[in-house]
Amino acid sequence: MAGLWLGLVWQKLLLWGAASALSLAGASLVLSLLQRVASYARKWQQMRPIPTVARAYPLVGHALLMKPDGREFFQQIIEYTEEYRHMPLLKLWVGPVPMVALYNAENVEVILTSSKQIDKSSMYKFLEPWLGLGLLTSTGNKWRSRRKMLTPTFHFTILEDFLDIMNEQANILVKKLEKHINQEAFNCFFYITLCALDIICETAMGKNIGAQSNDDSEYVRAVYRMSEMIFRRIKMPWLWLDLWYLMFKEGWEHKKSLQILHTFTNSVIAERANEMNANEDCRGDGRGSAPSKNKRRAFLDLLLSVTDDEGNRLSHEDIREEVDTFMFEGHDTTAAAINWSLYLLGSNPEVQKKVDHELDDVFGKSDRPATVEDLKKLRYLECVIKETLRLFPSVPLFARSVSEDCEVAGYRVLKGTEAVIIPYALHRDPRYFPNPEEFQPERFFPENAQGRHPYAYVPFSAGPRNCIGQKFAVMEEKTILSCILRHFWIESNQKREELGLEGQLILRPSNGIWIKLKRRNADER
């Protein structure tokens, strides 16, 4: 009887304990929720003085106003910056997250020069499934250590080794374009993009994927689809939760694309690492290093051998993060810059003639590949590229997560705010670029750029987290453009308003870049 009574008491104690635990968990959840709401309310109140767009609602902010279509969304943001150009900054709420848009050189400088405000926006977390915590997405000590390790791999003497690859792929591109000479206008955007993809694959991984010959490869499709899905998800707060995202068809497609991308990169890394180990074994037993004697060096080879201050090498996962980052950042941005350059040159024949004359001066009638010395002499072409990136920056906006409260133009910007720098608007400030919509490469002549605010032009970002690969990008852009322009005369077939600007992760023309080609004949010019 006593045993039965004790059993009943024990059962009641268990039930009471479970109920108490549930009550405690529920109370903790409610308390946590109340704390979040209170924190949100404080932020809302404290940031009230910052100029803002009308019709922001609690919790959802301006999210309901945001256009879902990439083209309409970008146009909406640019219209806001034009409307509020007289204001030093502009506040937007994306769900419960406050954002301040910066398009004024003095205020952009505050964020980009700070050694404390180096954390990338929380929105970059949507890149992490693909890129991990590589140079683009990492923060704090990991970023500092990784940046220090990788900076030597972008030294110009190393970049020179990649010029042969750039020349070879540019010549393949020219052969592909030959069929369009004296034909109807065609969309050149994808041609250029595939060329840039071939270049970054071979320079980053030592792998020639032949994208220009096989544009339907599984890897190529996955690269483009992944970029589209990431941008779409960033704009839609209701897709931010991973478990919820996987309930949609796009979430499963994201997972499948991710598997394709990582499988490819992992296999290339393993293959390259095995080759390096085999060569080391050969050297160890006196057989030399013949297997890799004629193999071109790639960024991957440098990553496999680079060490930190303590002599530690990167892990396989670390290397994959950086290779995937090179792939993501290294082809779309460059391809966009080249496409926009072709559009602007085709729309401004007087500028194209000046480039023509410079090419004649440097190359004459020779069809030899460009050398490093040739590229250094193409100063006017470099000004064309700079002016192109002013009008159409490859990355039209990027963000930092404010890691501690700061002051911008007299306004208090709170920790946790997303500071969004908008180069597309920044580069159109008439104080620094009179007649900002006009294409004038001469703006970047040294005498004309003198005295311009150093943060009025940031196509590669600026400060501690500037683009580590900008020299590589400019080298590739000059190589491909000079190769195209030595063979063809470009005519654009679109007006500016017909381009349909789409500011995804990269600034693209939603309607493509349509041009006509004529064979260039130096004797007639």
Curated annotation (Swiss-Prot):
Membrane topology according to the record: Single-pass membrane protein
Main location class: endoplasmic reticulum
GO cellular component terms attached to this protein's record: endoplasmic reticulum membrane
The keyword Iron appears for this protein: yes
Presence of keyword Lipid metabolism: yes
Ranges annotated as spanning the membrane: 13-33
Pathway assigned to this chain's UniProt record: Lipid metabolism; fatty acid metabolism
Listed Pfam families: p450 (PF00067)
Cross-referenced PROSITE patterns: CYTOCHROME_P450
Any one of the GO BP annotations: fatty acid omega-oxidation
Regulation of its function: Inhibited by N-hydroxy-N'-(4-n-butyl-2-methylphenyl formamidine)(HET0016) with an IC(50) of 38 nM.
Disease: Bietti crystalline corneoretinal dystrophy: An autosomal recessive ocular disease characterized by retinal degeneration and marginal corneal dystrophy. Typical features include multiple glistening intraretinal crystals scattered over the fundus, a characteristic degeneration of the retina, and sclerosis of the choroidal vessels, ultimately resulting in progressive night blindness and constriction of the visual field. Most patients have similar crystals at the corneoscleral limbus. Patients develop decreased vision, nyctalopia, and paracentral scotomata between the 2nd and 4th decade of life.
Known role: A cytochrome P450 monooxygenase involved in fatty acid metabolism in the eye. Catalyzes the omega-hydroxylation of polyunsaturated fatty acids (PUFAs) docosahexaenoate (DHA) and its precursor eicosapentaenoate (EPA), and may contribute to the homeostasis of these retinal PUFAs. Omega hydroxylates saturated fatty acids such as laurate, myristate and palmitate, the catalytic efficiency decreasing in the following order: myristate > laurate > palmitate (C14>C12>C16).
UniProt-recorded name of the protein: Cytochrome P450 4V2
The encoding gene: CYP4V2
